[in-house]
Amino acid sequence: ADGMSFAVFDGMGGAAYGEVASEIAVQKLRKYEKKLKYADGTRMLDQLVSSFTTEANDAICDMLAEKHCTTGGTTFSMLYFLRDSIKLYYLGDSRIYRYKSDGLTRLTRDHTVANQKVDAAIYTEEEAKKSPDQHRLTLFIGSDHKKLGLNADSRPLVPLEMGSKFLLCT
């Protein structure tokens, strides 16, 4: 499985531009497919994913500007198999879970206003779950309108364990 990757995108925005945004992101990721397959470590992988998210973000922002649309984009989650581990990348609220014999564990944290307020001690975890802010995304592909460079969030390598299953969902 070394070098294999799996990704999910969930377009958002009115007038069907979310669907267009997610398709743009898929096409940009396909451009990186061969390079990703042969990445020789996490540093190279991080650089490739950063280049992909920046390129996809800029293309989506250009498309939205052409359509005179101020909002839109796509969430993104990706699993990459690297030797006996996996590397996770994500933007938005498309989650990645691991299922093994002791249950289901969420491996990502949503990029939402509610979670920012939890971090700032404005909300408790319970208040955040009930807040409309839990659906207001702070990061996604298409959120960097100034085109400063968009980096996906990631986690340290997650060891692969016999019988583990991974779920990418939106």
Predicted regions and their residues:
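PP2C/PPM-type serine/threonine phosphatase catalytic domain
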Residues: A1-T170
